[in-house]
Amino acid sequence: MTTIVSVRRNGQVVIGGDGQVSLGNTVMKGNARKVHRLYNGKVLAGFAGGTADAFTLLERFEAKLQAHQGNLERAAVALAKDWRTDRALRRLEALLAVADEHKSFIITGNGDVVQPEQDLIAIGSGGNFAQSAAIALLENTELDAKTIVEKSLKIAGDICVFTNGNHTIEVLDYSAK
């Protein structure tokens, strides 16, 4: 799988992920891009799960963003509805972490839309490790969101064999607004 982490702090939301693609116990690729900017750079999205499945969901989510004029919550709910009712989509095994300047959501393979606690999302095989690290850093430091994401991904990569050190990190800075 992979590790995707999102942290919101002090006028920034950041999503980061590693680049490892595995097939069973074999690393197939180390530099996959699993974090993307959508809707003219106003929305961040990261995915964990089967790569082809995740790209399919990412494309569908981007279409929902367009259809709902960039309204993140409406797009997430619309995708989740499709996910639950479309037989082909129900077979896709992936998770999405999405965020804009106002809200963050996890969209699950069961068609659930979850708004996280503590302005923190961590999904994928290394998600629990990254979440633990991020919580500790959020509660005990004044580090910015990007640094917390970087450190959380590093810790997850040191523990999880399905997470590597090749990170893609995207930042939405809305502190000046």
UniProtKB/Swiss-Prot annotation:
Listed under catalytic activity are:
ATP-dependent cleavage of peptide bonds with broad specificity
- Sites binding Na(+) sit at G157, C160, T163
Keyword terms of this UniProt record: Allosteric enzyme, Cytoplasm, Hydrolase, Metal-binding, Protease, Sodium, Threonine protease
Query: What GO molecular-function term can you cite, just one?
Result: metal ion binding
Per UniProt, activity regulation is: Allosterically activated by HslU binding.
Which Pfam families is this protein grouped with?
A: Proteasome
Catalytic residues as annotated in Swiss-Prot or TrEMBL: T2
- Where primarily located? cytoplasm
Q: Name one GO cellular component term.
A: HslUV protease complex
Entry EC no(s): 3.4.25.2
Q: Where does this protein reside within or beyond the cell?
A: Cytoplasm
A Gene Ontology annotation in the biological process aspect, one of them, is: proteolysis involved in protein catabolic process
Describe the protein's quaternary organization and the partners it interacts with. A double ring-shaped homohexamer of HslV is capped on each side by a ring-shaped HslU homohexamer. The assembly of the HslU/HslV complex is dependent on binding of ATP.
Question: Family assignment?
Answer: Belongs to the peptidase T1B family. HslV subfamily.
Role played: Protease subunit of a proteasome-like degradation complex believed to be a general protein degrading machinery.
Give the protein name, as stated in the record: ATP-dependent protease subunit HslV
Protein species of origin? Aeromonas salmonicida (strain A449)
The organism's taxonomy opens as:
Bacteria, Pseudomonadati, Pseudomonadota, Gammaproteobacteria, Aeromonadales
